[in-house]
Amino acid sequence: TLNGAAVERNLRAFELGRWAVLHPEDAKRVMTPNVVALPKTLDEKIAFRKDHLTAYQGKGLAKRYGAMLDKITDDRLKEAVALGYHKLLSYKDEYEVARLLKSTRAKVAEAFEGDPKMTFNLAPPIMSKAGADGRPMKRTFGAWMEGPFNILARMKFLRGTPFDPFGRTEERRMERSLITQYEADMKDVLPKLTDATHDAIVALAELPLQIRGFGPVKQANEAKAAKRREELLAVIRSGGTQSSRAAE
């Protein structure tokens, strides 16, 4: 096995099985399917993302998101922007991780009796070294981290400000610059929307969905997306006269 990964998984599976035998009622609650109705219509998808941005940062960010979408009447393009713009605006930083973990803790408390303890596998940017694959190595933190996480989740108002202690990292600066760039691109290309440029503009609007991952992985995907962005902008600015394959 690679670094004992399979052994660790087997041990976890064994512990999980033993826990299920000792706590059958809790196991039953956890294994009961939790069916969530996903948004289906475009309006539902937009409303869902507005709610998420409000929880992520506040009403101001949701309003900023909505203002962009209000400028678009073409449904296909509007959905592309709804997805792409939302992904950029809601980059997963330390404050969002803390908020999500706080939410997870509340769900765990509902699912289990007593006072279950949680451990966290994290790779804090200011504390983590790169592994052999170039990715930050994760460290295990105990339940004592719940207190700091609760505080951190309430400090999201610092996000993107000069007082943000995490905002100076290369990844955070990149994420903020991508938002500014996207807004400028949409302002540039929306007036150029025609039948000939439509597919290229939709592809440009959806491009942020390709920037996945964290750390070196995200940076590599961003570099690929940057190259693709230049290709699409060239098609759009030429009136869609270049090879149609550039927008596929």
What are these model-derived regions, one by one?
Residues 2-248:
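Active-site loops and adjacent core secondary-structure elements that bind or stabilize anionic groups
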